[in-house]
Amino acid sequence: MNQTLLSSFGTPFERVELALDALREGRGVMVLDDEDRENEGDMIFPAEIMTVEQMALTIRHGSGIVCLCITEDRRKQLDLPMMVENNTSAYGTGFTVTIEAAEGVTTGVSAADRVTTVRAAIKDGAKPSDLNRPGHVFPLRAQAGGVLTRGGHTEATIDLMTLAGFKPAGVLCELTNDDGTMARAPECIAFAGQHNMAVVTIEDLVAYRQAHERKAS
């Protein structure tokens, strides 16, 4: 990742701390991966406190595939099968079947309905019957071990939520340009600035976790 582009957001460790502060304040974070990987930026928000306005922003400026990052334990709790048995996607992204809240939604498409679905899936004591399948929210199962196991946006989202003190569940969506192309780092950074989001890279988070876990041991 081009460090010059990111320099205004501080050092790698400062960027992680600023991202955690942003999440705790209810703001979004732009998570960038490497140019050699997907080369994309994902908007992420805490699933517990994401607002309808933030969901609307995500739908308006994102790919349209609004994802809920969850752990394997939560996937089992909700009895969500993986979308396919044999995952042949380039990065092994862990999609489960799609979901809709069983109550409190109309068609499930609106920003408010998608927030309702997210809340239904992550509430304490959530049961499989709280969700209909299929739906308009795409759960993503994170790998155990987070970014130290798999350097994906899914794992980064779970790691950031956990470090910020939230339940391990977050909403993500890839940022797109107005012409429908994928936003790359310069566009992602500009968008984050316009919408008061912190910016962090997966590489930053890997280094941060490694350093802190070394200290702890």
Swiss-Prot record:
Residue(s) at site: Essential for catalytic activity: 136, 174
Stored Gene3D superfamilies: DHBP synthase
Residues that, per the record, bind Mg(2+) 1: 38
Pathway: Cofactor biosynthesis; riboflavin biosynthesis; 2-hydroxy-3-oxobutyl phosphate from D-ribulose 5-phosphate: step 1/1
Catalytic activity: D-ribulose 5-phosphate = (2S)-2-hydroxy-3-oxobutyl phosphate + formate + H(+)
One GO CC term, this protein: cytosol
One GO term of the biological process aspect: riboflavin biosynthetic process
Summary of subunit composition and partner proteins: Homodimer.
Function in brief: Catalyzes the conversion of D-ribulose 5-phosphate to formate and 3,4-dihydroxy-2-butanone 4-phosphate.
This protein's name: 3,4-dihydroxy-2-butanone 4-phosphate synthase
